[in-house]
Regions:
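Basic, Lys/Arg- and aromatic-enriched nucleic-acid-binding interface segment
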Residues: 2-51, 55, 77, 136
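Phosphate-coordinating loops and pocket residues in cytosolic domains that bind phosphorylated ligands
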Residues: 6, 27, 56, 64, ...
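Basic, Lys/Arg-rich DNA-contacting stretches centered on the C-terminal catalytic core
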Residues: 7-11, 25-33, 51-52, 65-91, ...
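Catalytic-site neighborhood detector that most strongly recognizes the C-terminal catalytic loop/helix
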Residues: 16, 75-76, 150, 157-182
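Short, solvent-exposed alpha-helical surface patches in well-structured domains
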Residues: 24, 56, 92-93, 152, ...
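C-terminal catalytic core of tyrosine-transesterase DNA break-rejoin enzymes
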Residues: 42, 46, 52-53, 134-160, ...
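Residues in the recognition helix of alpha-helical DNA-binding motifs
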Residues: 57, 97, 113, 117, ...
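Active-site/catalytic core of tyrosine-dependent DNA strand-transfer enzymes
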Residues: 75, 87-127, 139
Length: 184
């Protein structure tokens, strides 16, 4: 039997947002319809929560005093529960915007609102397309640059091992950009 050659995997650079793009996105989310999309955008950006996970979250799962967000197994991509840390920039975004526990984090018709926020922040289909999961990749890259721990990042992201993080999630970020990300 002839052996089949394995194709060589060529990884592409991981797209992440630059500090200026983050500032524009957060400002746009804060200004859009009274900031109703800002908590969800903040959780994707500063906690690495997947878009479909944040769409399922309720405020009851957010504990600002313990600085954690509980992702239930039925809401996660991998089917496992996890506690995600609420880092200081996210605390600032959430502390004055909390809603009753039974309310969802995302407003009704979330996909349409999220598309509008991105468009108003400058991401257009052809001229400046939005990269899927760019906020999750941005979080992973800045987290690793700041905390320097694949193990900690793996827990935050809900990954079984760090191999996927190393090859598909993390882009190298240098000090000044990392400092700007975490000092908002």
């Amino acid at each position: 039997m002839a052996q089949v050659e394995r194709p060589q995997v060529v990884e592409k650079p991981i797209a992440i947002l630059e500090p200026e793009e983050i500032t524009t996105l957060l400002r746009t989310a804060a200004e859009y319809e009274g900031g109703k999309c800002l908590p969800a955008v903040g959780m994707m950006l500063y906690a690495g929560i997947r878009p479909h996970e944040v769409a399922r979250l309720q405020w009851a799962q957010v504990n600002l005093s313990e600085r954690s967000i509980c992702i239930h197994p039925q809401h996660s991509k991998t089917g496992g529960a996890r506690l995600v840390t609420i880092h200081p920039p996210l605390v600032k975004l959430l502390q004055d915007r909390q809603q009753p526990p039974e309310h969802r984090i995302c407003p009704p018709q979330w996909p349409q609102h999220w598309r509008r926020v991105r468009r108003r922040a400058g991401w257009q289909r052809r001229l400046h397309p939005w990269t899927p999961d760019v906020l999750r990749h941005t979080f992973a890259s800045y987290h690793l640059s700041h905390f320097r721990s694949y193990a900690e990042l793996q827990l935050e992201m809900g990954h079984r091992d760090s191999a996927l993080l190393r090859t598909r999630y993390v882009s190298a970020v240098q000090g000044k950009k990392t400092e700007r990300f975490w000092k908002r």
